[in-house]
């Protein structure tokens, strides 16, 4: 049986602005997304029957249709029935390294890897834009997870404009047992700040375009790490931090550590990241955070930016 091993990187948000509601129920967003080294390992293997199977080493990850990776395989089977008949179904094995429900796009990057893996298994020859378009029907972060790198994302997150790559080091912190519902975060933001949403279509388009002129984008273009750190922004912090004191605690503690240039919550949380000066400083910050919060429930990671999305590690 043919098999592909793929690397599925996590992402963080360097910028997240909520602009308005959309008719499809999503939000109109302006974001800057960044791929990081922290990644899951995905194996996609052909089966002799036309079934889909999902295995995962993490007990909290479902293996049925509620899993985005399963739905990605089901989408490919529905879109390409002749290939399914010719090559058979797929078995997907997920080796989780990315924390679950962490605001790091773990589920989305798994789905992106499955789309790419099945494309290879079935010799479909799909382009990256075609894979991104398929992914957008499943989830807003999936197109970015296919593309990777440093990207401006608008619409609901599916419209991508690449930026020059960054060479940054981050420390990530998250409590294992703490989860923040993305749906809750956006719903609460709408309830509390919906009166600030733009209404006019022309204004929406202008605001989405204006993100290209934001100070953080200029800092990225200039590779000014200090300025990038100062311009980190996430609207969802306005509702998540007051409701989740543990997330606020991590953010405030990161801000006091020597060598931390900037800190912010990623996505809807609960992961908080700190941009630091060097690998040595990152390891020192990790130790300082562990000493300040000697709680086994706290996960800490040192990672760095990467320039790509899903990659093939090997094939059999």
Go through each PLM region and give its residues:
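ATP-binding N-lobe of GHMP and related small-molecule kinases
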Residues: 1-102, 120, 124-129, 166, ...
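Short beta-strand-to-turn element immediately C-terminal to the catalytic PLP-Schiff-base lysine
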Residues: 17, 45, 145-147, 151-156, ...
């Amino acid at each position: 049986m043919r098999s592909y091993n793929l690397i599925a990187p996590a992402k963080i948000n360097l910028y997240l602005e909520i602009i308005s509601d959309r008719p499809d129920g999503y939000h109109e967003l302006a974001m800057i997304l960044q791929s990081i080294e922290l990644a899951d390992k995905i194996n996609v293997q052909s089966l002799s029957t036309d079934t889909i199977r999902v295995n995962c080493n993490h007990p909290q990850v479902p293996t049925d249709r509620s899993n985005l990776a399963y739905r990605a395989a089901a989408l490919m089977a529905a879109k390409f029935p002749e290939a399914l008949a010719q090559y058979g179904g797929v078995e997907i094995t997920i080796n989780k390294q990315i924390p679950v429900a962490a605001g790091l796009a773990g589920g989305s990057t798994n789905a992106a890897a499955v789309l790419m893996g099945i494309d290879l298994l079935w010799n479909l020859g799909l382009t990256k834009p075609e894979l991104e378009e398929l992914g957008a029907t499943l989830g807003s972060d999936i197109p970015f997870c296919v593309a990777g790198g440093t990207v401006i994302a608008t619409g609901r997150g599916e419209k991508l404009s690449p930026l020059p790559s960054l060479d940054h080091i981050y420390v990530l912190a998250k409590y294992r047992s703490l989860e923040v519902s993305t749906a809750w975060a956006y719903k609460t933001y709408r309830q509390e700040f919906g009166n600030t949403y733009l209404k006019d279509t022309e204004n929406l388009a202008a605001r989405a375009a204006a993100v290209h002129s934001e100070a953080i984008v200029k800092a990225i273009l200039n590779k000014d790490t200090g300025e990038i750190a100062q311009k980190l922004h996430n609207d969802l912090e306005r509702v998540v931090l007051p409701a989740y004191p543990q997330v606020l605690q991590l953010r405030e503690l990161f801000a006091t550590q020597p060598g931390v240039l900037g800190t912010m919550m990623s996505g809807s949380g609960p992961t908080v990241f700190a941009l630091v000066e060097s690998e040595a400083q990152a390891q020192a910050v990790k130790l300082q955070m562990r000493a300040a919060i000697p709680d086994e429930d706290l996960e800490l990671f040192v990672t760095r930016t990467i320039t790509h999305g899903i990659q093939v590690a090997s094939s059999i």
